[in-house]
């Protein structure tokens, strides 16, 4: 159970960690602080100038600097207007320095946090994405970062500028009359208690707001990505209600936080102005030998205190929002990255793949997905995995490039355990094409030559497209290989998108090829062309094929029949048909059998 003390300690640690991101901008930050010091120093100056103004009304002949050469003749009525202009200019300089340079720090902080969060996404393990809502991930980069920078910069602006204003005003008041000023100081403990109470509520409510905002982003993202399904199945009303509920929940939580601030701020003002009322009574009652100017200056300085004190109390809301946002950001930044303890790096492997006694449980579950899997594939061999959905085929394919780590059994590539390879080097030797194709909102050429392939000669890109039978439709497009494909290739057909993914794999020219339902989105004619291309490409490469279609696997050197995470049969297409077993039954059904209940 989290105690108030541990929660407060946690908040302080989070806030100081957040402030560490300001370190690269420390020079600019110090300039902004200098600006706020200048700004704050003008507040007691304004109160002091009123003293001379009032005294000048009663004694027009009085001079401001009787002991200063060249200024001893300067009368109050002449000096006061000039000083007011100078004070205003001094205040303007401070305001510019403080606001401009703090804005530079704030924008730099937003950029740094967003880039670090995004870069972290690229090295997080697969299991993190399996269990984390994508809308919340996006919300952290967009919404949470904005709140965090408010705490790291805007809040500091208020704390420094208004805090220094309060300090300078209190110093001035103490110099004027220290006894009366102690009356004002007596209310500080009460203010501290009220601010502390409000801070706890603000942080709790801020966490709820962030979750609600993540839900809004998630629903919107899902609906936009699946708009065709939404329209095809008449899901508009359902999605409208789902989004309205998420947005309404966010609105209610925002209002609850606003309500908290709306209650605490007037209460705080009441306490401050009550103290002011007592102070004014004492000033008038105990005026002694003070001049009218002294009284006006003292009351003016005291009257300038409520505004900065109120702003200091309200900054708690900004800080707690930022701390709550920073907590979720640091949770993501602290997630352990993909394990990469390997040391071996090879320029090229032959593609000899061997799996020994491999078993696998998905993280955070007790269900065994793979059970004692063993097989080997020589370079140039094609191994086909068949079985009903949920039998473990795709899981096995995902273990080879180490999208998930295995602990039971071995996977060897050219006789080396894949965990001993450097992760980037291992994946360099593997090309993978999945049923769900990912294309980026870029040109066709850049989608084929993606990542490490960027910069490949145009001739190689076109050759890969030709081998994947994609060039024929690309040449018909207005801009050819420079045509923009839209978000995730929305401007292309399913078969066209699949052929671009295959072209990307062909351009990579990796010795190990994994085809996970790679031809499932193609029509019969396109599949025939692709199959011919794959027959050529697979020469000299180890190919692991996962398919539900007969034409894809009939030429395999070995077919592994999987069920419930085990290999139940193995052999060539002809051998397995002759056994008249599980494969023969799948073959009779077209190799596409539904998964049992609860299959993953």
From Swiss-Prot:
The protein's UniProt keywords, in alphabetical order, are:
ATP-binding, Cell inner membrane, Cell membrane, Lipid transport, Membrane, Nucleotide-binding, Translocase, Transmembrane, Transmembrane helix, Transport
Q: Which residues form the ABC transmembrane type-1 domain?
A: 30-321
Task: List residues binding ATP.
Answer: 387-394
Residues of the ABC transporter domain: 353-589
Q: List the disulfide bonds.
A: none
The record, for SMART domains, names: AAA
| Superkingdom, natural source | Bacteria
Keyword Transmembrane on this protein?
yes
State the NCBIfam families in the record: MsbA_lipidA
In the record, the note on similarity to other proteins reads: Belongs to the ABC transporter superfamily. Lipid exporter (TC 3.A.1.106) family.
The protein in question is named ATP-dependent lipid A-core flippase
